[in-house]
């Protein structure tokens, strides 16, 4: 986001007026803005750390990343420090190795889930 981008700009002495996450991602993926690439790389690393913490807190077997801008840069995420940071939990790294990580790319997962739940409920009602 803009705060992370501002921190990278300050650290590198660069400044470009990119404030929207979508603009930062576009500039990073197009490769013409080094600070945008560094910002996106930092975002992926932080996301990996947070996702690893959440997986441990909840005893997850799968981590689902949904919504936002992540579906736009899955290849970048795969080549980033995301997984390294996800696993960097000391003695818990072995457990996290077995945790599946998925990015939901469907544009309406909430509606899809609601439709599936409704279908299941209707099937149960019909079976009675």
Give residue ranges: language-model regions.
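ATP-binding/phosphotransfer module of carbohydrate and carboxylate kinases, centering on a glycine-rich
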Residues: 1-128
């Amino acid at each position: 986001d803009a705060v992370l981008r501002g921190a990278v700009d300050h650290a590198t002495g660069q400044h470009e007026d990119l404030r929207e996450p979508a603009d930062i991602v576009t500039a990073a993926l197009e490769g013409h803005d080094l600070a945008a690439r560094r910002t996106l790389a930092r975002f992926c690393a932080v996301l990996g750390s947070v996702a690893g913490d959440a997986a441990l807190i909840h005893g997850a077997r799968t981590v689902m990343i949904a919504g936002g801008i992540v579906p736009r840069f899955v290849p970048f995420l795969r080549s980033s420090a995301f997984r390294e940071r996800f696993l960097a939990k000391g003695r818990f790294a072995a457990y996290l190795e077995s945790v599946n990580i998925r990015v939901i790319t469907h544009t309406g997962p909430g509606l899809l889930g609601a439709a599936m739940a409704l279908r299941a409920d209707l099937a149960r009602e019909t079976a009675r």
